[in-house]
Amino acid sequence: MLTETSLITEETILVANLETRYLAGGPDDGVPIVFLHDGAWGGASDVTWSHVLPLAAEKFRVIAPDFLGYGGSAKSIRVDVSPFAFRIRHMFSLLDSLGVTEPVHLVGNSFGGSIGLRALADEAYRGRIASVTTINGTGGPWKAPDMAKIGDFDGTRARLEEILDILCDPSDGQEAQLDARFGWAAVPGHFTAMRGPHMPVPAALRVERPADPYPAPLQGVATPVLLVECTGDTLLESGWSKALQAVLPNAQAELLPYKHCPNITHPRETWDLIGGFLDSTIQGGK
């Protein structure tokens, strides 16, 4: 768990009667940046963003929630809708509770990046989004075969270490990252929340769901988007950022030479890239 600093504090509040943990910091009147964590086993706001948030909070108002089912938030999920939909609604309900009504900049890694893109694809939320930055989060498509390697988890630290090796480049903070991620993975309810949507349904009860139109709803959306693709990432198909850039007229694609989570292993370099994009986007919007 992230140790509280003078810049970043940890809070838990009720949102729609569901415990919701989030990290926050920076000036109260700063431009709001919402950081969205990855969806791997043991994912949480501090696991994904602990080294980036203090850098961002020097200038921006930062808010980093734990998604439902993850971290210190309620282990409450919906299995009748997509894994994105109910978490997007919960995220904006949290912002409402915090009095954040102006458009926010969404910054996500992996599943968190996909949440940002899926929110942008939804006309109900598009007006509340000033920009989206996604680091190796595609919104769902373009998965590579290695994605299957991080799905199974037997509850052991050794298995989580194998998953972490796929997600992250080697770094001095690897043991601390493993400790934090394993701590959240062991919280009661997390395993069930992760496994629940994948439970087999008897043939007699199976209902064919409508085809997913994504990414077509993003076609022509002019909101600024930063697509960060990593050349060492084996979980996604190479070139996914160019494919999305072809759909989004105001998207910028950048490459980094790392694995799936450079925000964890190379926080300063990652933040410099994101911060530069945010500065240009904010200045361009004035």
Q: Where in the sequence are the language-model features?
A:
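Short beta-strand/loop motif that positions the catalytic acidic residue
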Residues: 221, 227-229
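Gly/Ala-rich beta-loop-alpha elbow adjacent to hydrolase catalytic centers
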Residues: 108, 112, 116
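Conserved HGGG/HGGXW glycine-rich cap/lid loop of the alpha/beta-hydrolase fold
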Residues: 18, 23-74
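Flexible "cap/lid" loop of the alpha/beta hydrolase fold
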Residues: 117-122, 126-162
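Active-site loop/oxyanion-hole signature of alpha/beta-hydrolase fold enzymes
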Residues: 64-107, 125
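Catalytic active-site module of serine/aspartate enzymes centered on a nucleophile-bearing elbow/loop
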Residues: 250-286
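Acidic catalytic loop of the alpha/beta-hydrolase fold
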Residues: 232-236
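Conserved alpha/beta-hydrolase catalytic His-Asp/Glu region
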Residues: 143, 154-219
